[in-house]
Amino acid sequence: MTATIDDQEKNQRSNPDHEEYQYLDLIRRIINVGEVRPDRTGTGTVALFAPPSFRFSLADNTLPLLTTKRVFLRGVIAELLWFVSGCTDAKMLSSQGVGIWDGNGSKEFLEKVGLGHRREGDLGPVYGFQWRHFGAEYTDADGDYKGKGVDQLQRVIDTIKNNPTDRRIILSAWNPKDLPLMALPPCHMFCQFFVSLPPADSPGSKPKLSCLMYQRSCDLGLGVPFNIASYALLTHMIALITDTEPHEFILQMGDAHVYRDHVEPLKTQLEREPRDFPKLKWARSKEEIGDIDGFKVEDFVVEGYKPWGKIDMKMSA
């Protein structure tokens, strides 16, 4: 069973082709016809499986940062740089005023998932560890893993530069061997990059870089807006380092769900019209940044972000 947006409602939209409607229309569909399901957190969800992909243009420095509510951009950037650094310590984010991992890194939560021997904040071999040290033996968040495991992120960058038509430009956070060691298995778990080569009649133009990300568990209220912005930013970062043009970010979802206690706040969000997406500029040049590890929070300059106000939703851990 599917629910469609009627023509009358579409005609009332001032900008019916705005890419944010992909997100809003999926939320409406889930609320209307989704399957009511129990879940790990005890909150309960309304869910659909494998909805159509979202596609967001990254051309002309566009950043698909949702506008029908304010997205915590500073938190998105800090978390992304935390991933890139390979860090697995939630306290490193907390010290920057970003508490999005505090619930999963609390002593109470770690004990609940059988990891009570870890110190508070030690999340185990989560995203950043897999990106930079896949296959290395994890000890704790304070270990020195330099040169250990597979640096997938650097391999992605090297392959884009040296073999751009490769069909194996993959970044995976899903490592079955390490799942029992993680405070929370990865939700956004896998992505593939694709380089479109310059056309024959324009050999001097830059190749175009796109990213497809698969997300197994998709919290539409809180997580997905964050994840869209994060992987769009990652694509922009890699494009700068590899001298390619950011082109498109595609999100394919598995279990796409709305938590039961998010339904009413999201109905408020559905009443809002999307505004123009902002633009991303770099405060420093490619030469000044140097490599993927050279980015700083201050390098991300987002211009023209004029969202609607914040909508509070509780996180289920």
Swiss-Prot record:
<dbReference type="InterPro" id="IPR020940">
    <property type="entry name" value="Thymidylate_synthase_AS"/>
</dbReference>
<feature type="binding site">
    <location>
        <begin position="167"/>
        <end position="168"/>
    </location>
    <ligand>
        <name>dUMP</name>
    </ligand>
</feature>
<protein>
    <recommendedName>
        <fullName>Thymidylate synthase</fullName>
        <ecNumber>2.1.1.45</ecNumber>
    </recommendedName>
</protein>
<keyword id="KW-0545">Nucleotide biosynthesis</keyword>
<dbReference type="GO" id="GO:0004799">
    <property type="term" value="F:thymidylate synthase activity"/>
</dbReference>
<dbReference type="InterPro" id="IPR045097">
    <property type="entry name" value="Thymidate_synth/dCMP_Mease"/>
</dbReference>
<feature type="active site" description="Nucleophile">
    <location>
        <position position="187"/>
    </location>
</feature>
<dbReference type="GO" id="GO:0005829">
    <property type="term" value="C:cytosol"/>
</dbReference>
<dbReference type="GO" id="GO:0006235">
    <property type="term" value="P:dTTP biosynthetic process"/>
</dbReference>
<feature type="binding site" description="in other chain">
    <location>
        <begin position="216"/>
        <end position="219"/>
    </location>
    <ligand>
        <name>dUMP</name>
    </ligand>
</feature>
<keyword id="KW-0489">Methyltransferase</keyword>
<keyword id="KW-0808">Transferase</keyword>
<dbReference type="Pfam" id="PF00303">
    <property type="entry name" value="Thymidylat_synt"/>
</dbReference>
<feature type="binding site" description="in other chain">
    <location>
        <position position="40"/>
    </location>
    <ligand>
        <name>dUMP</name>
    </ligand>
</feature>
<dbReference type="InterPro" id="IPR023451">
    <property type="entry name" value="Thymidate_synth/dCMP_Mease_dom"/>
</dbReference>
<dbReference type="GO" id="GO:0005739">
    <property type="term" value="C:mitochondrion"/>
</dbReference>
<dbReference type="InterPro" id="IPR000398">
    <property type="entry name" value="Thymidylate_synthase"/>
</dbReference>
<feature type="binding site" description="in other chain">
    <location>
        <position position="227"/>
    </location>
    <ligand>
        <name>dUMP</name>
    </ligand>
</feature>
<dbReference type="InterPro" id="IPR036926">
    <property type="entry name" value="Thymidate_synth/dCMP_Mease_sf"/>
</dbReference>
<feature type="binding site">
    <location>
        <position position="219"/>
    </location>
    <ligand>
        <name>(6R)-5,10-methylene-5,6,7,8-tetrahydrofolate</name>
    </ligand>
</feature>
<comment type="similarity">
    <text>Belongs to the thymidylate synthase family.</text>
</comment>
<feature type="binding site" description="in other chain">
    <location>
        <begin position="257"/>
        <end position="259"/>
    </location>
    <ligand>
        <name>dUMP</name>
    </ligand>
</feature>
<comment type="pathway">
    <text>Pyrimidine metabolism; dTTP biosynthesis.</text>
</comment>
<comment type="subunit">
    <text>Homodimer.</text>
</comment>
<dbReference type="GO" id="GO:0006231">
    <property type="term" value="P:dTMP biosynthetic process"/>
</dbReference>
<dbReference type="GO" id="GO:0032259">
    <property type="term" value="P:methylation"/>
</dbReference>
